[in-house]
Amino acid sequence: MQLLKKRILQDGKCYEGGILKVDGFINHQMDPVLMKSIGVEFVRRFAATNVNKIMTIEASGIAPAIMTGYLMDLPVVFAKKKSPKTIQNALSTTVHSFTKDRDYEVVISADFLTPNDNVLFVDDFLAYGNAALGILDLIEQSGAKLVGMGFIIEKAFQNGRKILEEKGVRVESLAIIEDLSNCCIKIKDQ
């Protein structure tokens, strides 16, 4: 995805500790044209699967998941980071946020994640794989099946992909960051 890579290099900001800030176009202010391109690419990569539901975790995964769901004409469900009083048949798990350095209990209603679902998980970042592992747990609890995981940006210098692939997960990342040393963004050629 050349458009995405160009945007990361142009507008992404690097901070110590392996943090890449893309809040000007992905996860605070969003670029709808870029989001559409991201959705189109996820559709291209997962069109041959039997996916019938798109899943994400709030909040930064919602925009790319909605775009992908819209383009595939599929429902989108997201795991919530706070359990509303109105949720019924809740499935829950604990997820550690790398960026915020805290744990969240994430929940989803079993009414919206069932054994009949073939799930594509879409999110903004893959770092250590914490959110993805939490989603795997929710999918297992529900009896649904995972067809794959799509990430806008992957940090290859962290071990999220390795952990997921060891569990048999298909991982597709649209931009892979090889290194952020000295606040220089190095993107892998794909």
From Swiss-Prot:
It is found in: Cytoplasm. GO terms for biological process: purine ribonucleoside salvage; xanthine metabolic process; XMP salvage. 5-phospho-alpha-D-ribose 1-diphosphate binds at residues 127-131. It catalyses: XMP + diphosphate = xanthine + 5-phospho-alpha-D-ribose 1-diphosphate. PANTHER family: HYPOXANTHINE/GUANINE PHOSPHORIBOSYLTRANSFERASE, XANTHINE PHOSPHORIBOSYLTRANSFERASE. It comes from Bacteroides thetaiotaomicron (strain ATCC 29148 / DSM 2079 / JCM 5827 / CCUG 10774 / NCTC 10582 / VPI-5482 / E50). The keyword RNA-binding does not apply. InterPro entries: PRibTrfase_dom (IPR000836), PRTase-like (IPR029057), Pur/Pyrimidine_PRTase (IPR050118), Xanthine_PRibTrfase (IPR010079). Keywords: Cytoplasm, Glycosyltransferase, Purine salvage, Transferase. Its main location: cytoplasm. Xanthine binds at residues 20, 27, 155. Homodimer. Belongs to the purine/pyrimidine phosphoribosyltransferase family. Xpt subfamily. It comes from the Bacteria. Converts the preformed base xanthine, a product of nucleic acid breakdown, to xanthosine 5'-monophosphate (XMP), so it can be reused for RNA or DNA synthesis. Its EC number is 2.4.2.22. The keyword Glycosyltransferase applies. The gene is xpt. GO terms for cellular component: cytoplasm. This is Xanthine phosphoribosyltransferase. Signal peptide: none annotated. It is an enzyme of class 2 (transferase). Pathway: Purine metabolism; XMP biosynthesis via salvage pathway; XMP from xanthine: step 1/1. One of its GO terms (molecular function) is xanthine phosphoribosyltransferase activity.
